[in-house]
Amino acid sequence: IPQDLSGKMLTFPKEEDDDDVKLMTPK
């Protein structure tokens, strides 16, 4: 897994950055 902004956002907990995760991962 590349240590890019996208990767970091995906790995970050949803509770931590729900907004960021939503932007990166479409529901």
Curated annotation (Swiss-Prot):
Q: How is the cofactor bound?
A: Binds 2 calcium ions per subunit.
Q: Does the keyword Calcium apply?
A: yes
Q: Does the keyword Calcium apply?
A: yes
List keywords of the entry alphabetically: Acute phase, Calcium, Secreted
Spell out the subunit comment: Homopentamer. Pentraxin (or pentaxin) have a discoid arrangement of 5 non-covalently bound subunits. Exists as a dimer under reducing conditions.
Any further remark recorded for this protein: Shows sequence similarity to serum amyloid P-component-type pentraxins but binds to phosphatidylcholine.
Q: What is this protein called?
A: C-reactive protein P1
Q: What are the top taxonomic ranks of the organism?
A: Eukaryota, Metazoa, Chordata, Craniata, Vertebrata
